[in-house]
Amino acid sequence: MARTAEEWRQRPNLDSNLIVDPRIYTDPEIFREEQERIFDKSWLVACHESEMPEPYDFRTYQHPGGHNIILVRDEDNTINAMLNICPHRGNLLIYEPSGSIKGASPSGGPKRITCLFHAWAFDAKGDCVDIPRCAEGYQERVKKGDYGLRGVKVEVGYGGFVWVNMDENAPSLKEWLGGSLEAIGDTLTEPLEVFHYHRAVIDGNFKMWHDTNSEFYHDYMHYHNRITGMMHPGYWDREYRTFEGGHAQVTDMQLKYESFKGHEKRELGWPGLAPGRWALVDLFPGITFNIRAPSMRLDTAIPLGHNKVLVEFRGLGLKSDTPEERAIRIRDHNSIWGPFGRNLPEDLLGTYGQGLALSDRTDAPYILQARLEGNKIHDEVGMRHFLERWQELVGRDPSDPYHNQPRAAE
């Protein structure tokens, strides 16, 4: 029979690392700490180099720490990153999500980022190149050489993705990754190209979304995954491998697409993966490299608050694809991972359902991440490993974030 209110609130007699206080998903103050201590210190994927292929192409990026960033390719073909804010009066410089500054804009001349407010202008490297009537108004007190944009640390790598880090003292991208992408290094050796982009806004915490990529116990929710994976040899042998920094890899397997009605047998592979093989790496705090030959998907989670997350989905193929190969990759990607695909909507629904149910902590005094299966595919070690790193950075115990719960007996 159903439990009483007192029984419902009773804390399970489990080790503390197997229990999570749901308030870490719902507390606005904890989210502000995450912005400062996690997102402002992490390397994050802002876009892919193929999304800004020509000199003077730009993209803007909504950084999870609350910053707006401009990414622009300069005349030397180098991608630069700067805060999207004018040093004069703090106005937003670029409003469009993407485009080019090669031609003139309503605010100013070509090859310039020009503020529409007072026409201060900057080049693609972030240097201030013009202040209208500077001498008349500022005399010698203000000089354009002192008023460049605020640069943001940026690296391009690991498949041509553009990574940014707000921390000027951050370790290199390679150090920060801690070897986590080396396991799929062979899949990132050839130039890639984005052929698909869509986004979803979910009423839930960003960690809820990352949880869906950090455990596969929820494969029961996916008809597609049950048919092509769970019912075949090799599925239960997959393992989680953890890396320093909160990152994790799921070992690859051969998917049986021929078991799914309407799906022809895969004949097109991916560098480092035979047709139909699947590899996945989760990066802390919200990036997932997900490759099911013949296509690749990259997820990036951008929290919009403690209870809302924007997830970007990119589908990628090889830059060297023939038109026929690209068509195969697009069809495969969109039929599985597109907005109406056979795999993705269930994950969105899972996160949305958690966001609804956990909005009132009295309705869920705790949640479990207690599956221990020797790091095999249904072990929840990926979630626990994520929160171990989370605890190191935020300084709160996920099972007792306010230090007011007695610990379970060891």
What are these regions (language model features)?
Residues 1-2, 25-28, 34, 116-122, ...:
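Short low-complexity stretches enriched in small and charged residues
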Residues 51-168, 174-178:
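Rieske [2Fe-2S] iron-sulfur-binding domain
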Residues 39-43, 91, 218:
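Generic structural signal for secondary-structure transition and capping sites
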Residues 41-46, 51-54, 133-138, 279-285:
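Short Pro/Gly-enriched beta-strand edge/turn motifs at strand-loop
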Residues 20, 24-70:
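Non-catalytic accessory segments flanking enzyme active sites
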Residues 7-22:
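Short, contiguous pre-domain boundary segments
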Residues 1-3, 16-17, 410:
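Non-catalytic, topology-defining segments of multipass membrane proteins
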Residues 78, 84, 153-410:
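C-terminal catalytic domain of Rieske-type non-heme iron oxygenases
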